[in-house]
Amino acid sequence: MDIETFLAGERAADGYRCGFVAIVGRPNVGKSTLMNHLIGQKISITSKKAQTTRNRVTGIYTDDTAQFVFVDTPGFQTDHRNALNDRLNQNVTEALGGVDVVVFVVEAMRFTDADRVVLKQLPKHTPVILVVNKIDKDKAKDRYALEAFVAQVRAEFEFAAAEAVSAKHGLRIANLLELIKPYLPESVPMYPEDMVTDKSARFLAMEIVREKLFRYLGEELPYAMNVEVEQFEEEDGLNRIYIAVLVDKESQKAILIGKGGERLKKISTEARLDMEKLFDTKVFLKVWVKVKSGWADDIRFLRELGL
């Protein structure tokens, strides 16, 4: 018997818990920021713009008593109907199918019809924990107003529990972990204790570039783009990464590149620095732009992209 098997058996005997936790909510309520704080490391991209998360991202947090496997989902889309958004909504539904706990995230003092649409998608026989995020905002600093808001949302659904947090500042994150833990099944850990994601380096590189696109472009343009890793080569002390950004029109390509190529250069430089920090190695990054008209409504092409 190897040491890992022995330790896993010891943990099971001590009531160790391990399970899957889906983080869901309408776009832009802070789901990705919340997951990054829960696992203690940035692996899911964040932006003030909606729909930055397109793929389900698995983050893992392990302590002495439990292992939490978090699934960060795209924000459920009720606007901008196209094949891409239909596929993103299907991703949310699929993510809910095999989890032990659902964390439903709403923005403090703001419960909308879009939140209600997400609530209707939640499973009836899986524990759902309400998380009220952004309690650092001025309107949420009144304790009595916040308590009234939580009561209002709890009246909409049979939640197993509720917690108010600030994902941005990491407030009450430890409390949330303790709230989730009893709903995880008793089990040995599924992943090594030092593992924080099951996603590949290629996937993480792609996500970093997408984050920079959302950060440095306008409100609409990033939604008409997709990022593809064309080549990823790992050498001794250097990762060579070649990434194509797919756009719908030549005019979008010009906007992305910017005057004299300055915008694309800035996006590429910041993405490279983030990759070097994440991968703990030097990175050579080449980013270029390709035009493919109508890609967001091409179902076959979306399947090829894994969406």
UniProtKB/Swiss-Prot annotation:
One of the record's GO molecular function terms: GTP binding
Keyword Membrane found: yes
Binding site for GTP: 25-32, 72-76, 133-136
Cysteines paired by S-S bonds: none
Domain Era-type G, residue spans: 17-186
Cellular component annotations (GO), alphabetically ordered: cytosol; plasma membrane
Stretches for region G1: 25-32
Region described as G2: spans on this chain: 51-55
Domain called KH type-2: residue spans: 217-293
Keywords of this entry: Cell inner membrane, Cell membrane, Cytoplasm, GTP-binding, Membrane, Nucleotide-binding, Ribosome biogenesis, RNA-binding, rRNA-binding
Cellular location(s): Cytoplasm; Cell inner membrane
Primary localisation category: cytoplasm
Topology in membrane: Peripheral membrane protein
Region G5, residue ranges: 165-167
G3: region residues: 72-75
A single BP term in Gene Ontology: ribosomal small subunit assembly
Keyword Zinc included in the entry's annotation: no
Gene3D superfamilies referenced in this protein's UniProt entry, alphabetically: 3.30.300.20, P-loop containing nucleotide triphosphate hydrolases (3.40.50.300)
Chain's role: An essential GTPase that binds both GDP and GTP, with rapid nucleotide exchange. Plays a role in 16S rRNA processing and 30S ribosomal subunit biogenesis and possibly also in cell cycle regulation and energy metabolism.
Record's subunit section: Monomer.
UniProt record similarity statement: Belongs to the TRAFAC class TrmE-Era-EngA-EngB-Septin-like GTPase superfamily. Era GTPase family.
Protein name listed in UniProt: GTPase Era
